[in-house]
């Protein structure tokens, strides 16, 4: 199938990399030529035509690739990005003299049982938890912001507001972003997050938990696309957040 595949475009002796867009609605119909659209990271028609032209040959590509405008195309960005951000943020926080104890974990079973996160949280019993995952963008053809909210690639880290997401932890993340002038986005929900946060927040006696997400195009496909600006924003915000936590932290809504 063409959908979700990484491709190489040969243009005037140079190679331009891209991804064939995919969306759930396309799996319900017989494909037409107009359904096959290639994303090269361009932000406008003029930007795209400066790098490719009609008639350029296209072939499949199997490696990770850097796209235009500091964007990355690869498989498994969900959730390798989360693991990378956690480690880089912890390292940066340590370099800045962070005094709180930090446990960084990459756990198994998130897509099925979430047992890895549940066991880890129960054993550590942290004061709070921030889960790093990815979220769907709504900025390409076939998506509808009116249904799922407006999430933009390059729009910054995404903070979650829902019944599983601890309000005071979210507010601290938002404050951290404002402190270092990092733009951010929101997404809302009313139930499960479909991330490890669903298990962590119920572990032990209950753990104040939230999710910080990286905007991602074409999730669960061989050619996922992210913005490295968003990735760096998540690293910086998480490091700032960690440096702002002291032993006197209070997350009780009526006392903090």
Regions inferred by a protein language model and the residue ranges of each:
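N-terminal hydrophobic/helix-forming segments and targeting peptides
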Residues: 1-256
């Amino acid at each position: 199938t063409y959908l979700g595949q990484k491709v190489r475009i040969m243009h005037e002796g140079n190679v331009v990399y891209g991804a064939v867009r995919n969306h759930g609605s396309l799996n319900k119909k017989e494909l037409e030529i107009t359904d096959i659209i290639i994303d090269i990271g361009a932000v406008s028609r003029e930007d795209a035509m400066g790098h490719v032209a009609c008639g350029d040959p296209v072939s499949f590509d199997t490696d990770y690739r850097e796209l235009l405008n500091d964007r990355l195309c690869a498989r498994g960005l969900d959730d390798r990005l989360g693991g990378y951000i956690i480690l880089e943020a912890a390292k940066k926080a340590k370099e800045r003299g962070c005094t709180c104890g930090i446990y960084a974990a990459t756990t198994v079973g998130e897509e099925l049982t979430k047992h890895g996160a549940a066991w880890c949280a129960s054993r550590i019993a942290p004061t709070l938890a921030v889960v790093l995952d990815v979220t769907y963008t709504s900025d390409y053809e076939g998506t509808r912001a009116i249904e799922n909210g407006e999430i933009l690639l390059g729009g910054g880290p995404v903070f979650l507001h829902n019944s599983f997401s601890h309000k005071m932890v979210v507010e601290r993340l938002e404050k951290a972003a404002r402190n270092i002038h990092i733009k951010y986005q929101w997404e809302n929900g009313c139930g499960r997050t479909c991330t490890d946060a669903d298990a962590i927040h119920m572990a032990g006696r209950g753990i104040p938990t939230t999710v910080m997400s990286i905007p991602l195009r074409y999730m669960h496909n061989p050619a996922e696309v992210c913005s490295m600006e968003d990735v760096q924003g998540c690293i910086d915000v998480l490091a700032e957040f960690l440096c702002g936590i002291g032993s006197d932290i209070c997350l009780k809504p009526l006392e903090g």
